[in-house]
């Protein structure tokens, strides 16, 4: 009986260890995007595109989606280095700060580009979520994105007037490689993209490139010119015909699959 019990414990431990080592770690940048606000008591708090922010401006819903798919969510409050990115499978940089948003913004520097580029080359999955040109630090962000053939344009595309949601509608074709279930999405006031090899457009609106993917070394880069799937547009606020919640699920599944594929190729 003791032998059976010991064997059972060993099997359970092995399964737990296996699940732990295969879970994808998704790290959200808190260094280039570091906005703060004061509460009613005057205390300073981080907000805007963080896992912890449960208001309209946060990514708490996206974090829940990723966890539901077996991922581990993390954040990085320091500059990306080889050591700091160790153990991260998916690294998300969203809406780097301008001086309008943060008194002393942390701009993306050459050493950051070098570290991230090597990490992607080794199999990392990088997600770049910008913003329209008036609300993102574009110059330094482009020094990073251009390492993978992607440039965020200095524009403000797909403007929406108030609650005229249809002005922000895009239609995803069936059989899309990333968005397998989402068909009608809401995405407004973004920067469009210009690309060159190795980047490829995965979604266009006429001649405007909206979403691009770049395969670099053993890794992958996903880019769109808007923070997009934060709580405001994934928690039921939009009219029912919009599939932003499905898009968030589709993108999460695709990113995790990319990370698994890249990790397998690194063996």
Residue ranges of model-derived segments:
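Bacterial Sec-dependent N-terminal signal peptides
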Residues: 1-24
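Short, surface-exposed patches at the edges or C-terminal ends of soluble domains, predominantly
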Residues: 22-267
């Amino acid at each position: 009986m003791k032998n059976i019990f010991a064997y059972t414990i060993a099997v359970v431990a092995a399964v737990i260890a296996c699940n732990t080592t295969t879970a994808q770690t998704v790290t959200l940048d808190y260094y280039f995007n570091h906005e703060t606000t004061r509460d009613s008591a005057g205390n300073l708090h981080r907000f805007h595109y963080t896992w912890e922010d449960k208001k309209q401006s946060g990514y708490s819903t996206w974090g829940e989606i990723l966890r539901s798919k077996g991922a581990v969510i993390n954040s990085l409050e320091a500059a990306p280095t080889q050591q700091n990115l160790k153990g991260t499978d998916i690294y998300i940089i969203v809406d780097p700060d301008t001086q309008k948003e943060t008194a002393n913004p942390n701009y993306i520097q050459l050493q950051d580009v070098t570290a991230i580029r090597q990490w992607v080359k080794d199999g990392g999955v990088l997600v770049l979520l910008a913003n329209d040109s008036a609300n993102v630090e574009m110059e330094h962000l482009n020094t990073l994105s251009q390492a993978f053939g992607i440039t965020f344009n200095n524009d403000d595309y797909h403007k929406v007037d108030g609650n005229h949601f249809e002005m922000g509608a895009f239609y995803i074709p069936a059989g899309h490689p990333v968005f397998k279930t989402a068909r009608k999405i809401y995405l407004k006031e973004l920067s469009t993209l210009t690309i060159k090899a190795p980047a490829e457009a995965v979604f266009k609106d006429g001649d405007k490139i909206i979403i691009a993917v770049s395969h670099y070394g053993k890794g992958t880069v996903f880019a769109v010119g808007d923070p997009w799937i934060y709580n405001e547009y994934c928690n039921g606020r939009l009219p029912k015909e919009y599939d932003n919640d499905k898009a968030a699920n589709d993108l999460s599944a695709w990113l995790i699959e990319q990370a698994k594929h890249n990790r397998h190729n690194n063996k």
